[in-house]
Amino acid sequence: GAAFSEFDRSKHVVEPFEVPYNWPRLRAADYGYSSPSCVLWGAVDWDGNIWIYRELYDKGYTGETLARIINALEEHDPLMQISVLDGACWSKHGTGPSIAETMIRNGTRWIPADKNRIPGKIELHRRLAVDERTDEPKLKIFSTCTNLIRTLPTIPLSKTNSEDVDTKADDHAYDALRYMCMTRPTGLPQNSIFNQIKKDSFQPADSVFGY
């Protein structure tokens, strides 16, 4: 069955609007070359809800090219408070720089994403659930994020582990969304969440480059 049967376009998808400049911004990425890379941008309102307002979804990008595209898309954005990237991107192959190092050298800041799969899936379920107090979910997606909207409701459960999704499915946007949700645990008090944002903002993403 579908892993996220609670996803409902009428509840979770909204038409784009101008995101307030003072809402903290998040960026999360799942990198691929032969398979698609997905980068998601989110903003956090003052009630702690995440609004996914932009996506980049394509394949065949080197780390350098992807970083350049990200920089161009963020030209008019405020500074990203937290940017998380698939931890595998820090793995070196041969003597050259890793994907993460290449992207950092080209002006995009990152820290490794929390890749705990089951807690990440649970956190996304919490975000998709309708809050009894507000009658609204804690996650909204702009209608322009077509690949996230297309793939999220179709991801099946794993046949070998019912607590996880099928990793052979088109899960690139899901992984990026999961990484983002894990930066914003819904169980934390609001003050703790924003204190964590401030802490992470000044945490070096890479000891070599000091970002």
Task: Enumerate the language-model features and the residues they cover.
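ATPase catalytic-site recognition across NTP-hydrolyzing enzymes
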Residues: 1-31
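Acidic, Mg2+-coordinating catalytic module of metal-dependent nucleases/exonucleases
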Residues: 167-189, 193
